[in-house]
Regions:
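Active-site-adjacent structural elements that line small-molecule/cofactor binding pockets in enzymes
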Residues: 1-182
Length: 182
């Protein structure tokens, strides 16, 4: 008989007054039995997710880490794949990679970034996700899309979790749910 999946709870946090406070928060989240510490990926009053998640992983031994969610438009997928694989490697395989097409108009406006129509953002996201997964795989990636072109890049380091860290997809529209289902 198959065992049901264990139900897990995570905590989302975004800021701390100091590095010591952030590490203490991560240890407290772990001590309370939560499975994962998540962070949003926005430009406002919060810590930058990648270094903050690494600090949280370094301060704990079992706590999983992740973003809810990395906005595809804020980082080229080659950069995000490298950062995600590095987080997974240095944390001993504890990354949960949350990604999405972007939704917070105010972030785009404040950063002077174009907020493209949903179809364009979702098309770009789907390509970005394919690039990330391709870079996590063994061998060189050759990818030709409308938004991204990758020529013979072998993504290094590779994540510990194989074939890749768990991927969470943020979104509620039918097309995003279809992408998540694949």
């Amino acid at each position: 008989m198959a065992h049901p999946r264990r139900f897990r709870f995570g905590v989302q946090a975004s800021t701390a007054a100091s590095g010591d406070d952030w590490r203490a928060l991560a240890r407290r989240v772990e001590d309370l039995g939560y499975s994962t510490l998540f962070m949003p990926d926005h430009f406002g009053d919060q810590l930058a997710p990648v270094p903050a998640l690494m600090a949280a992983a370094d301060a704990t031994s079992e706590l999983r880490i992740g973003a809810l969610v990395f906005d595809n438009d804020y980082k080229h997928p080659v950069v995000l794949a490298k950062e995600a694989a590095t987080l997974d490697l240095l944390s001993g395989g504890r990354l949960e990679l949350g990604v999405g097409a972007g939704w917070m108009v105010s972030d785009y406006e404040q950063a002077g970034m174009a907020y493209d129509p949903p179809k364009v953002r979702v098309d770009r996201f789907a390509e970005g996700l394919a690039v990330i997964k391709g870079l996590f795989a063994e061998g060189e990636l050759h990818f030709e899309g409308e938004h991204y072109r990758i020529e013979g890049l072998d993504g290094r380091p590779k994540p510990v979790a194989r074939p890749h860290p768990p991927i969470l997809i943020g979104g509620g529209a039918k097309r995003m749910l279809s992408i998540a289902a694949r």
